Amino acid sequence: MAEAANSDIQTYKTFNDFFTRPLKVGVRPIANAAFICPVDGAISQFGSIQQDQIFQAKRHNYSILALVANNTNLASKFENGHFACLYLSPKDYHRIHMPCDGNLKTMTYVPGALFSVNPNTAANVPNLFARNERVLCEFESVQHGTFVMVLVGATIVGSMATVWHEAIDGVKNGIINPPRSKNIRTWTYLEKNIFLKQGDEMGRFLLGSTVVMLFEKDTLQFNVDWQPTRGIKLGEEMANAL
C-alpha cells in the first residue's frame, strides 16, 4: 500500500477499486529504452516467434493465428517476429501500460475458457493463452510498426477494461467483460485518432492474469538481463530497437 496513490484502505468503496488501485506518480520511473515493461509481474516467456509458433512452455507451443482468433491478415504480420508473455499474480499492480508509443487501430474481444494462467498451468495446459477469454488490442507505431497487446482472462479474473472503452465508447469504467458473449466482437478506431504514449495506462485486470505482446520481425532486441520467471516492474527496460 505504500506505493498506492491512495494508501488509506478504508476509503476504497469496492473490492474492484482496491485491486485496481493506481500507483503514486513517480514510483515507477520510465527507462530510457525503445520498449519498456508494461506491467509489474514476472516473465513467463519471451523471444523469437518461430515462423508462426510461440513458445509457451516445454513441449507446448501455440500459433499466432490461434491467439488472434484466426485473423490471417493480423497473424501474418508477426511471423518470425518477437513475443513477450508476462504474468501478473493477484498481489501485483493490476494496471497495464504502453511499452512504446502507439496509435490504436482495433480492439477485439474473443470468448474462451477461464483456465488459471499461473506458471504451473502454463506448463501443463496446451494452447492456454489461445484458449482463454482475451482482448486483442492492435496498435500502429511510427517507429516500430504494428504491435499487439493481448489481455488474457483467467480464473476469478472478473473483468478486463481499457481506458478508451470508457472515454471513446462510453462504457462505464471501460469494462469489456462482462457482458460476456459467445461471439467475437471487434471495435475499429482508425478514424478516432487515439494515441497513447509510452508509459500511458491502457487497461487493467481485476486480480492477476497475463499479457502477451507481439511485435514484427526485426524490430527489437530484448534486455539481456531478462530470463523466464524473473520479476519485473513497470517502466524497466524491456527491449531496444533494431
Locations of regions flagged by a protein language model:
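Contiguous, well-folded functional domains in the mature portion of proteins
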Residues: 1-242
